[in-house]
Structure formats: structure tokens, C-alpha cells
Swiss-Prot record:
Vacuolar effluxer which mediate the efflux of amino acids resulting from autophagic degradation. The release of autophagic amino acids allows the maintenance of protein synthesis and viability during nitrogen starvation. It comes from the Eukaryota. CDD domains: MFS_Atg22_like (cd17483). One of its GO terms (biological process) is autophagy. It is found in: Vacuole membrane. This is Autophagy-related protein 22. PANTHER family: AUTOPHAGY-RELATED PROTEIN 22 (PTHR23519:SF1). Glycans are attached at residues 77, 275. It comes from Yarrowia lipolytica (strain CLIB 122 / E 150). The chain crosses the membrane at residues 13-33, 128-148, 163-183, 187-207, 284-304, 315-335, 389-409, 426-446, 457-477, 486-506, 525-545, 554-574. The gene is ATG22.
Length: 589
């Protein structure tokens, strides 16, 4: 089947998807949703030692409440001097809305005695800092299930664009609906966070599915001015091109043919498409980060000018949702449907009578769900045959879990322990993004072109492990070890560099260990491992906080998650891994 030529307008439509969605992760998930959920949890909390007594904190005012003054950030009869500059007032208000204590910026260095606050969550009492962590863990679990279940529908058949738009609009609406969530409806806030994060993950995977098709439509690495019509296949018994049925879960965006790799011309063609796909993907990532940067700037201004209250956080999330929704328009107008090939006959539900009813009820949807799960299972079985791939994936599972959980833990620690304002936390998030771009560009240069990729991974993981290790120092020293807000700014730059570098070097190393011609299915497992690991970290951190009521203890867990895989990575033999991959290249699927 011929591929329709990719036009410049269609490419802009794909870029619009990244431009629309990425601010959700950069701004909403990384900065404001954890703050809002923790603030609401504390406002509804009770004392840990007496559940009949609420924690001593008045609710944070926001427009719409009876008796709220014109400036919702400044309560009536405020004892703070009105001469405090506007750029410091955000910090002052954040301290005032702290649920455990009321003190001015002059008392910031003092550590007042704080009661331990807990909130009821599914029938049990948990620490208020655990509430956003459990929420995030549940959201990632749902995201993994949704992504695997819908992968077949987006990769095969006519649903690719429909699913991209559906999940994009669903994510935008659920993010914008945060503006209506008041403190007493904190459970709804948790629900919106779970649904919006799952929608983001599904939309991202749908977007990745377009990469190989768009790259295949650029014959000489350039777009076509006029779209060409696909020709009718002369032999319907032939399998569809690999560029059209690359598994949706592939995070690599690389298109490879399924034929023998011995043909030199075919290899050149494959490498060309890989380069084109990488170029498109890189531009999309850059535009996504730029959009996140712009929305973060807007949100910081909004948060400061509205008083750094929970109302400010909700407005910031509304901006993210509106941004995401508006830029679905160019996606709708410019991106082609790009239908994929039909499901393989062996997955037809008619071969399994007991599923025929389910497939009929879901209008054929059940076939696509089962196809996604079966594809993942086949890939997992193949990976088990390769020792070095298995070692890498286990190490990647732990590292990805640890480095991802650092972000949410740091935000909650900064808000709860260091009393940093939402605006300051947003600045911290921007530093992570900027530094992450630098890390992605510079990490491949570590040790020169002849450096072992395993050594590069060990170096970057060690850099990441320094973040929780530094937090642990706070148990033993009074002036260092995340005792001051400025320390978090420094660690944000350090962490961002490690985060950007880790994703780059791990992806490239994994690509060296897998069989040629099976890159897409193996990268699907790489992607699912990445997403699935993020369920465990927040869950364990939440359990630690519930037990100790001290978020700093979580740094021990994060340190273990990051240093343990170093031993696994050092056990990988790249030469042995390449030989295993070459052997599997000769094995028919």
C-alpha cells in the first residue's frame, strides 16, 4: 500500500498536537496539581492523634466565597504590613495559608511546632502529603491500562486521528474543570487529576503513532506541496507496509521494514526514514517545551497577581486546559486521518466465539483491545530470551521510577517543609525544563564518541542519585540538606540535567541491544516499562510518609531506587547483547 505524501500543513498539524499537550505535563503535573491537592487535603485534615479535631488552619479564601475581600490573597485585619512589595507578597501569602502554622517571612527560618495532619482516603487515614502521591500513582496505573488497551485501535483501522482528538479534548476539559473544584470537593480534584493524566498518556501515544507514517510520506526528507492519493493495493494478501503498522506503543518514533536487513538499499532507506522521523520528533519535542515555557510564564504572572492562593492554582490549571483545547483546532483541520491496516486475521473475534458478543456490543472495539495486550505479551516473551535486554529493562524500571518520583516529592517537600510559594515552585519547574534540554544535548558527549554507553548511563544515574542523597544530609546538618529554598533551585538545575541526559542515553543504548527489524515492538516494551514504573514510586513514598509523617524519609527510598540499578547496568555486556540481537534477527516472528 502506497503512503500518502506528507504535506507541510499536515506536519504543522502534528506539531500543533505537541504544542497543545506538553504544557499539561510541564505546568500542570510538574507544578500545580500536586500543590493544589496537598493544599485541599490539609484544609480538610484532622489531627493524627485525635480525628475529632480539625487541623488548626482556616480555609484559604478564593473568589466566590461569602465574605472574601476584593483581594482574596489578603485576609481581613491582616497584621502584615501593606508595604511588602508585590514580588515578595506571594511568599508571604503562601505562608499565611499554611495549614499548620501562621508566621511571617521574618519567622521563615524558625521551625514552629506543627501538628501532624491526616485525611480520610478510601476509608483509611493518610498523611496530607500522601494524598497527591496516591492520586498520581492511581493515575499512572490507569494510564498504562488505557494506553495498552487502545493501542491496537489507534495503530490498526481508522481510529488514529479520532482517538488523538478524543483524548486531547478529554484531557483539556478535565484539566480546565479544576477551576470549579473547591476545598470540600477534594475527591473530585483527585478524580480529575487521574483522568487528565491518563488522557495525556493516551494522546501522547496516539501522536507517536503518526511519526513513522509522516516520515514515510517524506520521500526525500521534505514535504509535498500537494497531497497525493494512495493507490489501490494490487494484492490484498500482501502485508501492509511496516511504516503503517508500527506498534503504537513505540516511543522511538522509528520506522523499520520487516523484511530481511541484508539488502543494502533497503537499509539505507530504513536509516533515512529513521533520520527523518527523529528530526520530526525532535522538532515536536522542542515546540512542546517552548509551549510549556510560555504557559509557565503566563501562569507565574497569574499566580502572583491573584495572590498565590488555591484560586490562583485553579486559574493556572484553567489556562493549561484552555491552551490544550484551543490548539486541538489545527490538529483537527490539518492532520489527516491516516488509517492503518486491518487487524491480522488471527485476532479476528470470530475465531473465538465466546468473544463475539463482546465485539458486537463494542462495535468491533474488543478486537483492538485484545490485539494491544497480545502484542505486548509477545514482545515480553521475546525480551525474556535476551539476558542483556532483560537486565536493561529491570534497571530502567527502577531508574525511571526513582527519577520520576523525585519531581513530585520535591514539589511537595518545597511546599510543605520549606513553605515555598506556587510562583517560586513554577520557577523551579522552568529551571528543570531548561536544564533538561541542556542535559539531552550534552550527555551524549560524556567521555567522547568512544565512551561506553553503559558508563555514560552510570554517570548520569549517579548525578541523579545525588539529589536524594543531598536531601538525606538534612537529618545530620542544620544549615544544609534542603533546609533553605535556594538549595532547591540549585538541585532543580542539577536534576533537570540528569533527567534530560538519562532519557537520551538510555534510549540510544537500548536501541543497540535489540534486533534489527523488531525495534518498534521492543520500544513498545521500553515505553510501557517507563510508564508502569511510575506507579510504584509515588505509592511507596506515600506509605513512608503515612508511617513517619516526614517527607524527608522518602529520600532514602529514592536513593535506593537510583543506586540499585547501577549494579544491573554494569552486568550488561554490550557485545553479548549485540550477538543475541543478531541471532533473533534470523528468527521469524
Amino acid at each position: 500500500m502506497d503512503i500518502v505524501a506528507t504535506t507541510q500543513k499536515e506536519l504543522y498539524g502534528w506539531y500543533a498536537y505537541a504544542w497543545a499537550a506538553e504544557p499539561f505535563m510541564v505546568v500542570a503535573v510538574a507544578t500545580y496539581i500536586p500543590q493544589l491537592l496537598q493544599s485541599y487535603a490539609r484544609q480538610n485534615a484532622v489531627l493524627a492523634d485525635d480525628h475529632s479535631q480539625p487541623c488548626d488552619s482556616p480555609p484559604v479564601p478564593f473568589p466566590g466565597d461569602p465574605g472574601v475581600p476584593t483581594d482574596p490573597g489578603i485576609p481581613p485585619n491582616n497584621s502584615l504590613s501593606s508595604s511588602v512589595p508585590w514580588f515578595l507578597r506571594a511568599n508571604e501569602i503562601q505562608l499565611l495559608e499554611s495549614p499548620d502554622t501562621v508566621h511571617t517571612m521574618k519567622d521563615h527560618k524558625a521551625k514552629p511546632t506543627q501538628p501532624t495532619c491526616v485525611i480520610k482516603f478510601f476509608g483509611i487515614y493518610i498523611d496530607t502529603a500522601s494524598f497527591p502521591l496516591y492520586t498520581f500513582s492511581l493515575s499512572v496505573l490507569l494510564q498504562v491500562v488505557v494506553v495498552i488497551s487502545m493501542s491496537g485501535a489507534a495503530d490498526r483501522g481508522r481510529f488514529r486521528k479520532q482517538l488523538l482528538l478524543f483524548f486531547g479534548i478529554a484531557g483539556a476539559l478535565t484539566t480546565g474543570l479544576f477551576v470549579f473544584i473547591t476545598p470540600k470537593r477534594y475527591y473530585l480534584g483527585s478524580f480529575l487529576a487521574i483522568v487528565s493524566n491518563a488522557a495525556f498518556g493516551a494522546a501522547t501515544v496516539c501522536g507517536n503513532a503518526y511519526l513513522p507514517v509522516l516520515a514515510a510520506g517524506m520521500k526525500d526528507g521534505t514535504t509535498s506541496e500537494e497531497p497525493s492519493e494512495p493507490s489501490t493495493p494490487s494484492d490484498t494478501s500482501k502485508p501492509a507496509s511496516r511504516s503503517e503498522n508500527t506498534p503504537l506503543l513505540s516511543a522511538s518514533g522509528v520506522d523499520y521494514e520487516t523484511g530481511e536487513s541484508s539488502n543494502t538499499a533497503e537499509i539505507v532507506k530504513i536509516d533515512h526514514r529513521a533520520n527523518v522521523s527523529a528530526r520530526i520528533s525532535g522538532t515536536g519535542v522542542a515546540l512542546g517545551y517552548l509551549a510549556g515555557f510560555i504557559v509557565q510564564i503566563i501562569s507565574i504572572y497569574l499566580v502572583i497577581t491573584t495572590g498565590s492562593t488555591t484560586w490562583s492554582l485553579r486559574l493556572a490549571l484553567l489556562i493549561v486546559g484552555v491552551w490544550w483545547l484551543i490548539f486541538q483546532i489545527p490538529v483537527l483541520m490539518w492532520l489527516k486521518p491516516r488509517p492503518g491496516p486491518p487487524l491480522p486475521i488471527k485476532t479476528d473475534p470470530q475465531n473465538h466465539p465466546w468473544t463475539a458478543t463482546l465485539d458486537r456490543v463494542t462495535n468491533g472495539g474488543w478486537s483492538y483491545v485484545t490485539y494491544g495486550w497480545k502484542t505486548l505479551l509477545v514482545t515480553f516473551k521475546e525480551a525474556r530470551q535476551m539476558k542483556d535486554v532483560a537486565l536493561f529493562l529491570v534497571g530502567w524500571f527502577l531508574v525511571s521510577d526513582g527519577i520520576t518520583t523525585i519531581n513530585s516529592t520535591a514539589v511537595l517537600f518545597a511546599q510543605g517543609e520549606l513553605r515555598m510559594s506556587p510562583a517560586n515552585l513554577a520557577v523551579m519547574g522552568m529551571l528543570v525544563v531548561i536544564s533538561g534540554i541542556s542535559g539531552a544535548k550534552l550527555t551524549p558527549l560524556i567521555g567522547g564518541t568512544r565512551a561506553s554507553p553503559i558508563k555514560s548511563i552510570v554517570v548520569v544515574v549517579s548525578l541523579a542519585a545525588a539529589v536524594p542523597a543531598y536531601g538525606i544530609l538534612g537529618f545530620f546538618f542544620t544549615n544544609i540538606g534542603l533546609k533553605n529554598p535556594w538549595e532547591l533551585y540549585v538541585l532543580a538545575v542539577w536534576y533537570g540535567f540528569a533527567l534530560g541526559g538519562l532519557n537520551t542515553v538510555c534510549r540510544s543504548t537500548f536501541s543497540m541491544l535489540i534486533p534489527r527489524g523488531k525495534e518498534a515492538v521492543f520500544f513498545s516494551l521500553f515505553s510501557v516499562t517507563d510508564k508502569g514504573s511510575s506507579v510504584l514510586g509515588p505509592l511507596l513514598v506515600g506509605l513512608i510518609v503515612d508511617k513517619t509523617h516526614n517527607l524527608r524519609h522518602a529520600f532514602y527510598l529514592l536513593l535506593v531506587l537510583l543506586i540499585t540499578p547501577i549494579g544491573l547496568f554494569l552486568m550488561i555486556d554490550m557485545e553479548r547483547g549485540r550477538k543475541e540481537a543478531e541471532y533473533l534477527e534470523t528468527v521469524e516472528e
